[in-house]
Regions:
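Amphipathic alpha-helical packing segments from all-alpha helical-bundle domains
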Residues: 85, 89-90, 97-101, 133-159, ...
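Generic hydrophobic, amphipathic alpha-helix propensity
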Residues: 23-34, 51, 76-80, 84, ...
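C-terminal peripheral helix-coil segments that are non-catalytic and often amphipathic
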Residues: 1-14, 101-109, 144-160, 179, ...
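Helix-turn-helix
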Residues: 2, 29, 33-71, 75
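Amphipathic alpha-helical linker/stalk segments
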Residues: 40, 74-104
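Amphipathic alpha-helical segments used for helix-helix packing
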Residues: 73, 113-134
Length: 209
């Protein structure tokens, strides 16, 4: 039977410095487990031992990919940002139906946990912004990418004449993201998605022609 060290070695980088397919899967499993635990609980209360147990990973595997908990947190921030931005980019926000479908998806995701955990990216920012400058910068970059994805869809709507006259798409993207964050926070503390639904529905009513 292979030892933990041998299993970790089998997942290490190839000669070009890239992770092997097995290594990518193992690292991804660890990051996903850490992201779930930190979202359901908090960054502070999530321990390395918790992550190992949730991911089914050994110490040698985890420390092969992450030097310490700080490095793991950085990977979690990137994971949450990549997931959110990818979903937003694929949502087809350039049409009214696509924007409404995205609204429904956001509400459905929040409803599954009755708002618990709040925004997967925003909650990390709230926990880390005052104590970890690097993490704060990472979260800010994630929000910037998210805003860019929203802006792209709103620009398509504007070009198609589907937005009411008023603020430009760049300003609307920031407004939508801020409304979304506020709605998710209220849904979290009230354990009810109605504030989120109200925020998004009001925004869509005000902007769509």
């Amino acid at each position: 039977m292979a030892s933990n060290g041998e299993r970790a070695a089998g997942a290490r980088a190839d000669g070009a410095g890239r992770l092997t397919a097995k290594g990518e899967r193992t690292r991804g499993r660890i990051v996903a487990a850490a992201a779930r635990l930190m979202h359901e609980g908090s960054v502070t209360e999530t321990t390395i031992e918790d992550v190992k147990a949730a991911a089914g990973a050994s110490s040698s595997q985890l420390y092969h990919y992450f030097a310490d908990k700080e490095a793991l947190v950085q990977a979690v921030i990137d994971h949450q940002a990549d997931t959110i931005v990818g979903t937003t980019e694929q949502a087809g926000l350039g049409t009214p139906d696509g924007l409404r479908a995205w609204r429904d998806l956001v509400v459905a995701q929040a409803a599954r946990s009755s708002g618990q955990g709040g925004c997967p990216l925003g909650s990390l920012g709230g926990q880390l912004a005052e104590t970890d400058a690097r993490a704060r910068g990472q979260v800010a970059d994630g929000f910037g990418r998210w805003s860019d994805a929203l802006r792209a869809g709103l620009r398509e709507l504007a070009a198609a004449g589907r937005l009411r006259p008023g603020p430009d798409p760049d300003a609307l993207a920031v407004t939508l993201l801020a409304s979304l964050q506020g709605g998710l926070l209220l849904a979290q503390v009230e354990r009810d998605t109605r504030p989120l639904e109200t925020a998004l529905d009001t925004f869509l009513t005000l902007i769509l022609a």
